[in-house]
Regions:
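Outer-membrane beta-barrel biogenesis signature
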Residues: 4-52
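Membrane translocator/pore-forming domains, dominated by Gram-negative outer-membrane beta-barrels
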Residues: 13-23, 50-327
Length: 327
């Protein structure tokens, strides 16, 4: 009998193309960048030992964030720069040495996201231009040295012009807006005092309510983008360690700060009815280092740099410089 022919192996299956367009990641990158753009904590406004009653502050902040979306199918790299300006409108001292402060603030910022999808040669870019208006209120138990308890709150409204464009595609534009409100408290304890300097440690807790609304959008090709509106709660637990002079307020004050961020920003959108989310982890851990000091009698400057990391290859690098002018 004729032997059976050897079986021919099946050819290797062709790799499946990515289920996602890179534009999907650009939309999600814009969504996250807008919500993060104007978020801040009390120390970002330049608090320091023996601050004067009235002051105006300016903060320039830049950050670079790398993250995934759609369970790792999308890769996003976002760069954001913001400028925030604020001024005290009212300062009221208490009979026990404390102080209340009330001020207003405004901000402007822009971000750019580059998005790629697994198995897709093309790229997409997302851009956000943002603007904010808000107010803040602060109480210090010890206004002169800022020892003991403090409480800070702020609220702001922001609006954004967004755009997304894939390689060779028509640019898509849409608008969004957001509201945020923050409550923060902490306690500054001095220790290790020498004849001229002392150490301070300051545990901090902050809770932020975040509301983000994005208008529905139909792309030129007919794709429907919806569902980018929701609210969320975020928290930050941290501790700040610094070393400062107790005899000369003009010397430099170095500091280091460790933070644990918990909670997610609004993180999903619907693309032709299919919901896609970013992969930002629930818990993120960060470290910031910086220094503050006087540049002139009524001018204080500061600078800081830091990084946050988390699961799903999440990384965030940031740097900021600020100036406060007292009157």
């Amino acid at each position: 009998p004729v032997p059976d022919p050897e079986p021919v192996p099946d050819p290797a299956p062709a790799p499946d193309p990515s289920l996602y367009r890179p534009e999907t990641g650009a939309y999600l990158g814009n969504q996250l960048a807008a919500q993060r753009m104007f978020t801040l904590q009390l120390n970002d406004r330049g608090t320091a030992q023996k601050s004067n009653d009235e002051h105006t502050w300016l903060l320039i902040h830049s950050e670079a964030t790398s993250l995934n979306a759609a369970d790792g199918e999308l890769s996003l790299d976002t760069n954001t720069t913001t400028l925030q300006l604020g001024t005290n409108l009212l300062t009221e001292d208490t009979t026990q040495g404390g102080q209340y402060q009330l001020g207003i603030m405004a901000g402007i910022g822009d971000s750019k996201t580059k998005s790629t999808a697994d198995g897709n040669y093309y790229r997409a870019t997302g851009k956000v231009n943002g603007y904010s208006l808000g107010a803040y209120a602060t109480w210090y138990q010890d206004a002169k040295y800022q020892k003991g308890w403090y409480a800070d709150s702020w609220a702001q409204y922001a609006w954004f012009d967004n755009s997304v464009q894939g390689d060779g595609q028509h640019p898509e534009s849409y608008r969004s807006q957001g509201v945020q409100a923050s409550v923060e408290t902490g306690y500054l304890l001095a220790f290790g005092q020498s004849s001229s300097r002392e150490w301070t440690v300051e545990p901090q807790v902050q809770v932020i309510y975040n509301r983000y609304d994005s208008e529905n959008h139909t792309e030129t090709n007919g794709s429907r983008i919806t569902g980018g509106s929701d609210d969320s709660m975020l928290s930050r637990t941290g501790v700040r360690l610094s070393n400062r002079s107790i005899t000369d307020n003009n010397t430099l004050i170095p500091y280091v700060e460790a933070n644990w961020e918990n909670g997610r920003y609004v993180d999903s959108m619907n693309f032709n009815g299919d919901t896609v989310s970013n992969d930002v982890p629930e818990n993120r851990y960060g470290l910031r280092v910086g220094v503050t000091g006087k540049a002139a009698k009524n001018i204080r400057i500061w600078g800081q740099a830091g990084s946050y990391v988390g699961e799903n290859d999440y990384t965030n690098y940031q740097a900021a410089v600020g100036i406060k002018v007292s009157f």
